[in-house]
Amino acid sequence: MSGLGENSLDPLASETRKRKPSSCDTPGPGLTCSGEKRRREQESKYIEELADLISANLSDIDNFNVKPDKCAILKETVRQIRQIKEQGKASSNDDDVQKADVSSTGQGVIDKDSLGPLLLQALDGFLYVVNREGSIVFVSENVTQYLQYKQEDLVNTSVYSILHEEDRKDFLKNLPKSTVNGVPWFSETPRQKSHTFNCRMLVKTSHDHLEDGSNLDARQRYETMQCFALSQPRAMIEEGEDLQSCMICVARRITTAERAFSANPESFITRHDLTGKVVNIDANSLRSSMRPGFEDTIRRCIQRFLFHSEGQPWTYKRHYQEAYVHGLSETPLYRFSLADGTMVTAQTKSKLFRNPVTNDPHGFVSTHFLQREQNGYRPNPNPMAQGIRPQMNPNLPNTMNSMPPQAMQQQNRNYGMGDPNSMAQMQGMRYKSPGNMAPVNQAPGVQQSPYQNNSNYGLNMNSPPHGSPGMNANQPNLMVSPRNRASPKMASNQFSPVPGMNSPMGSSGNAGGGSFSSSSLSALHAISEGVGSSLLSSLSSPGQKVENNSNMNMPQQGKICNQDCKSPSGLYCEQGQVESSVCQSSGREHLGEKDVKENIFEGSESQRSQAESKGHKKLLQLLTCFTEERGQSLMSSSSMDCKDSSNVTSPSGVSSSTSIGVSSTSNLHGSMLQEKHRILHKLLQNGNSPAEVAKITAEATGKDVFQETVSSAPCTEATVKREQLSPKKKENNALLRHLLDKDDWKDPLAKDIKPKVEHMDIKMGSCSSSNVPTSSQDKEVKIKTEPGEEVPGDLDNLDAILGDLAGSDFYSNSMSSRASDLGPKQPVFQDSPTLAMRSPDSMQGSRPPFNRAMSLDSRSSTPPVRNVNSFPMLPKQGMIGSPRMMDGQDNFGVMMGSGPNRSMNQHPGGDWAMQNSAVNRLEPPNVGSVGRPGPDYSSAMTRPAMGGNMPGLLTRSNSIPGSRPVMQQQQHILPMRPNDMAMSMGSNPYGQQAPSNPPGSWPDAIMMNQGRGGAQNRQLGRNSLDDLLCPPSTVEGQTDEIALLDQLHTLLSNTDATGLEEIDRALGIPDLVSQGQALEPQPDSYQPQGSPVMIDQKPPMYGQHYAGQGAAMSAGGFNNMQGQHPPFNTVMGQMNQQQGMHPLQGMHPRANLIRPRNNIPKQLRMQLQQRLQGQQFLNQNRQALEMKVDPMNPGGAGVMRPVMQTPVSQQGFLNAQMVAQKNRELISHQIRQHRMAMMMQQQQGQPQAFSPPPNVTASASMDNPLGGPPMPQAPPQQFSYPPNYGINQQTDPTFGRVSSPPNAMMSSRMAPSQNPHPQTTQMYPSPDMKGWPSGNMARPNSFPQQQYSHQTNPATYNMMHMNGNGNHMGQMNINSLPMSGMPMGPDQKYC
């Protein structure tokens, strides 16, 4: 009020009164007005000052919501003055306590100097003032308590020097803007501005970063402070400074509790489409929280929300369903951990977002609220919580098998635990390590993958159908396949010889062949990944031979020593024999076979390597393949070899210990085998040349070496390049032993054969059965056979050498109950996908018939029919290619009879059941190799990328062009062999429908595929072994081979374990084994032919049901769609097309499945994956199609109805999809067979050329299935059926399943079927099949077949549906539409 001077309120009033009249009376109104204006301005100024003096109540004045007027200010001033006076009067009566500085009743206003510190103490913070430039104008002294800085250290410094760099931008936003913009105070809101924000301030350390700039990041520590900022009005001036341009802040610590549970939790927003798929992520809010690692937080939160809510009371799907219905939804609280172990509690709230225009639901907007828990940064003791997948077996690669059995079992996901095979593996564990794992100490070279420890996704390797070829922990590289069968990755070790490990053979052995199909698939998978050989561990003892599982083809790191498992691993053990470990000999046998096949494949790559490899292959194959005893011998020998073989991963990847069932038998037989092997080794060690050894062996045994020698003889020089595995030599021994296993080397001629091994160190083992086309280039084995006596081309000799594969364990169907009949014989191939895939048998199966789709010679050498068990699948392909198969192969058509060794591995019982899991869908490899042997053995032998060697696979040869889907379907089809389709049909699902490929019925069809043309007609008299082994160009050469084999036998018999081991090394068997693993199938060589073989084998299952259809079914039974031959008749179709003259009539359409050979394991994997996916799609699509097909064929009412028997429960281990597919295949095959039988009768005079039904337009794909030549009308086959029987005849769509009554579906659509007679009634191949409910088949198949999954609509299985296949549907009424030209879709493949 001092500004008023002596004036008082009254004078002001009187002055005002005077002013008014003067303004009116004064003649100079302008002058008077100006004076009044000045006074008013002065008055307003004083009133503003007065208002400032009562600023304590400024907030009350602000409540006026208007600029305070003079009256209000004056009134408030008077009130406060009175209040002060009253307080002063009362204070005189108060005691000292009331006069304390802290008392609110103290005289006057609290002293500024004392008020500030008190307030700061109460707030637990410090005060600082920052100007608009960010310079600290003032800071309270207690800042030292918080930041360790002194007041003078911070004043006049930049606040940004103590702020975290990530907080500086936000801090700048909080600085006063009015001052910065120069906006006058009154233009702003009259209220004071305040806000709260958090920032991180640097705490001074002993060595301040301002003093020392080194290692600042390591030393800097920040304190999170909560700042309350206030911007003062412009009128507030102190000491000449305009505080309006400053921000006054009080900073206080944030407590741990507040930090952990902030009032405002972190959050981020995601946008989802109506299916719940993430469309957009808005992380701005988290990013602004300035917390490091917010990206990881978001990722983990979304993973937890979307992918780990299954099995919880809530799922994101339910959450969004609720949001869709109610518009809003929120999840319960869920938790996840960050990388540093901090636990975060989260909750998601979602809102349905609608299109503002149409109001249609557009998607969901989800806000995820995150709350970090206290003690936030604790290390996560459980890396698994972080999604870190600890290595299943932390042990060194050498200790891969070190896991305790229980651990192995735990890790082994034995989906097929019920399977004897899976049990076998578990039993195998008893052989020292869990899961037949080799002793804890693996060879140092063995690498253990985190998943090696029997992480069998499918079954343990042991499980017959599911168990991959003994995939166990040792197979780090095995691809884990979702399939029920243990995929190659299922048991990490599945191929390794380690006892617990399921070596390809081992697991198959464990599976007793039952696991073979899965094993084959697994091996196939492993091969595709190159996993097989690595399983082999260096053998602790020479006796222990780690036979590289070709199938495993795992890196040598995967090598596993089964030494610890002394018990023989009867590789060939039946499922029943799962307990006994697999015999090395069988492993060797498989190795030999696989090696041969692999060599053959290589041969396709190069004539030189092919010739050389053929020589070794012959030798190995002789050693491994001969005698039906093989399974039994293997079983028995496995015991002897057990120490070796159990430790040894057979070339087939069989761990002798892996087979559990045959320990006793293996021991007996193994003893003899071991003796022989020892002889051979001793001879070799003594410096005897291979020729000498062969002679000695022949002399010792008094037997001809083998016709295999004959086969090998033609390949005068075979250079087998294989990766050298330390255990290969031992594996070589295994092969030799396996050969020796066959006590009855029957070809005296072998004595005369003088093979020369230019490189003894080449490891025969390289011929390991691993399908992986790993060529062991480490060494080259050059075997020169000097012709001795002419070896009779008699297939019988080969049979003697290789043994009747049908009778042999190889043929035993692990899946089928018959496996027991075969006993240990079959297990080798069955159990070991590796064997199946790359086992010499497989190789043979695929290669031996140069022109034959299935390399009947190799597997077919042993008449598949002979096999009591329906050949599960290709596992016996090699067997099919074996001499007996060859016998049947005098004409490929005979293949059905003697060697429907097509990849189909015909089960004489008419079972298409895959021999093992290998044969099962999961195992295309053998099939591929077998099914699509190239024009020459080498090409035929070339392993399909998928592991065409796998006997159980109907894989079309890699070389055969074709749509991948077709390959895949074919592969699936192969796995779906009747056993597969029959689904564990121990006996032929169709009940020996056809005599299981009468010898005459298959040959042409099979040959067609193989022949691609006339090639299919390649000399029927050729021994399958010759074909497999690269048959000697001359009889003399064959004789030399036989002599050589005999000599080898003698040598091996006389050699001790060490000597045998040395011999193996000298022979380069280990190299061969690894090479076999490395060998990649030559796509060109097999191209269409491999598939046909696969198909051929399967037909046997169906052949029985339809009289005369055995061959027809084999050849054409599954040919159903000429264009579509891929599905079942693919091989046939291709063969027909390729050969143009030999429809694979004897072969099932599968035989025609020609999988293009993919040298790349990638193809194998792709095929496996496609199978799995394709099966699913096929199941879905086929079901839909089946439903459609029924109406399609009203005219052919019975056309599509499959007479499929419900698959035997054996396939319980198969995936439901696989089972369903197999069932469909069975149905389709039966239908086709039935139709084919009728059609053959009708069409015997008809040309083979494919012609879609009049009412059906063939799809382009039908024109060229699998990219293979369209099915040409083949000249009349050796079969009784017309050449185009099963090709042109309107068989069921290859794999078309009949959802509804086949007739109805097919006939309506295909009413004008080309078949002279509708297959309607024929459609129902058998009452069994009729019994199949369209929706569900009694078969263990988890997947109900669509109605009459048999509906032959190839479309059903072919993605062609009624369209592509429908074109043929007319034909398909009962006969599968001639879809040979149609490539099979991946779905079809599964049929």
Curated annotation (Swiss-Prot):
Function: Nuclear receptor coactivator that directly binds nuclear receptors and stimulates the transcriptional activities in a hormone-dependent fashion. Plays a central role in creating a multisubunit coactivator complex, probably via remodeling of chromatin. Involved in the coactivation of different nuclear receptors, such as retinoids (RAR and RXR), thyroid hormone (TR) and orphan nuclear receptor (hepatocyte nuclear receptor 4 (HNF4) and constitutive androstane receptor (CAR)). Displays histone acetyltransferase activity.
UniProt superkingdom: Eukaryota
Post-translational modification: Phosphorylated and acetylated.
Quaternary data: Interacts with the histone acetyltransferase protein EP300.
Positions of short motif LXXLL motif 3: 1048-1052
Residue ranges of the region described as Acetyltransferase: 1088-1274
Gene that encodes it: ncoa3
The UniProt record lists the keyword Signal: no
Primary location group: cytoplasm
Record EC number: 2.3.1.48
Residues carrying N6-acetyllysine: 614, 617-618
Protein name as catalogued: Nuclear receptor coactivator 3
Description of its domains: Contains three Leu-Xaa-Xaa-Leu-Leu (LXXLL) motifs. Motifs 1 and 2 are essential for the association with nuclear receptors, and constitute the RID domain (Receptor-interacting domain).
Keywords: Acetylation, Activator, Acyltransferase, Cytoplasm, Nucleus, Phosphoprotein, Repeat, Transcription, Transcription regulation, Transferase
Tissue: Highly expressed in liver and in early stages of oocyte development.
Catalytic activity: L-lysyl-[protein] + acetyl-CoA = N(6)-acetyl-L-lysyl-[protein] + CoA + H(+)
Region (Disordered): 1-40, 85-107, 636-666, 816-880, 1242-1279, 1299-1321
